[in-house]
């Protein structure tokens, strides 16, 4: 048994057929082949990056309740929802800080906001337009 094991290991393996080296084309042929390949290739070899669509940005309409800060307004956003059990419409409000570059909005103005990247620790909205000036 020991001889059979050693005999199996000692048996020569069947060699794989050697790959034939590809023929090299003459210099004039290489230029012709390169020009032909260049005509067939339409872009880079790697996969080009496709632009991903940006997520939909939230837009909200609310009333300015404070304009005391520089280039910042505080807007009160109102949300109305129906109570799941009793059906009564409940009004909830939320105050958000919004960027007002030119400081044009005043207290009581009805404004349109759009979500944006974080501009400060608490500011994530920007003023799009003033829909109605306060009286």
UniProtKB/Swiss-Prot annotation:
Transmembrane segments: none annotated. It comes from the Bacteria. One of its GO terms (biological process) is translation. CDD domains: Ribosomal_uS17. Residues 1-59 are annotated as: Disordered. Keywords: Ribonucleoprotein, Ribosomal protein, RNA-binding, rRNA-binding. Residues 8-42 have a biased composition (Low complexity). One of the primary rRNA binding proteins, it binds specifically to the 5'-end of 16S ribosomal RNA. Part of the 30S ribosomal subunit. Was identified as a high-confidence drug target. Belongs to the universal ribosomal protein uS17 family. NCBIfam families: PRK05610.1 (NF004123), uS17_bact (TIGR03635). HAMAP family: Ribosomal_uS17_B. This is Small ribosomal subunit protein uS17.
